[in-house]
Structure formats: C-alpha cells, structure tokens
Amino acid sequence: MFSRERLDSKLFRIVPMEENDYESVAEIFEQGIRGGNATYDLRASDWVIWDDKHLKHSRFVVKLMETNAVVGWLALSGVSSRAVFVGVAELSIYIHQDFVGKGLGDALMIHGIASSEDHGVWTLQSGIFPENVGSIRLHEKHGFRMVGYRERLGQMQSGEWRDIVLLERRSTRVGV
C-alpha cells in the first residue's frame, strides 16, 4: 500500500508534453483503462492519432525531479469543429496509480486551466464515470460543476452500459 501524503512540490515539475513523453502517457492511460472507471476506450492509440485528437496547447506532464519519470498528464480536445465552439474544450487528466492522492492532479489542473484561458478557452468540460469519485472531487475543487447526468451513454466491450457525469467549468477571465 502506498501513502496518500501530498508530494512536496520540490520533488516534481510540470512541463509541456513532448512526443517523447507519449510512451509514459499511454502507459498511464492504459492503467486507467485497466481500472475500469476512467474511459470507454479499449486501448491507448498511437502518437499520431493521439496528437491529432488533442489541441496543440495545454498539454502537460508531471515529471519526478529525481528520475524524470512521467507520473501524470493533462490534455485538451476540441468538442466541435464549429467556429462558435472554438473556446470550448474537453479536459482529460490521468495520474499514475502510485501517485493518486498526492496533489499532482491539483497541480496539473492549475496549469491546465491557466493555459486553457491563456489560449482563449472559455469553457472546459469533462465526462466522468460516476464511480470515479476522486476525479469528480478533483474537478469540483477546481471550479467544475455538474451540468448533467447522461444515462447509459456508452456500452463497454463487456456489454455493460455506463453512465457519465458531465462537468463544466466556465472561465472567469475569458468570454466574460
């Protein structure tokens, strides 16, 4: 069992994600898939597909100072190709299972929200399985609010239908 004590901020840094970080990003995403409460996806995509799906700005990884290991990441995806929604993005955040509850999600959220606003994003949204209480709490702590509950939105490969809690954060700096 690992400790849930917050990691001293001197022990990690948050940096823009680069292509050479993607192997670790994909491994952390695969942990989320195996955990069963993070995504509908069955596997991580390759870099080219992932890179195409996500906005080029507001991509961050958490790296440990001592080893340079990637232990968390955050990225945004556009929600529509329509011009009126250019300032709306979906936020994805994943933390390595050994580092959950240590404050890395907080640090990533602060960076991700600030960067999104610097790039003109006025609304962030996230769809989260209701069983993923930790992620819901993290989002709420950073100003997201529940705006909907989508029942049986997607069917898992096992045949199980899963609900989604829709959370949204409206910027107080952009589009006000």
Indicate residue ranges for each PLM-predicted region.
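Conserved GNAT acetyl-CoA-binding A-motif
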Residues: S116-I128
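Conserved beta-strand-loop-alpha-helix junction that forms the acyl-donor binding cleft
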Residues: V100, S126-I136
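Conserved acetyl-CoA-binding loop-helix of GNAT-fold acetyltransferases
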Residues: G101-A114, R137-K141
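Conserved catalytic-core motifs of GNAT/GCN5-like acyltransferases
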Residues: A75-G78, Q125-I128, E140, R145-R162
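A short beta-loop-alpha structural element at the N-terminal edge
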Residues: L11-V25
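Conserved GNAT-fold acetyl-CoA-binding loop/helix
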Residues: Y22, A26-D52
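Acetyl-CoA-dependent GNAT
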Residues: L42-D98, M109-I110, R170-T172
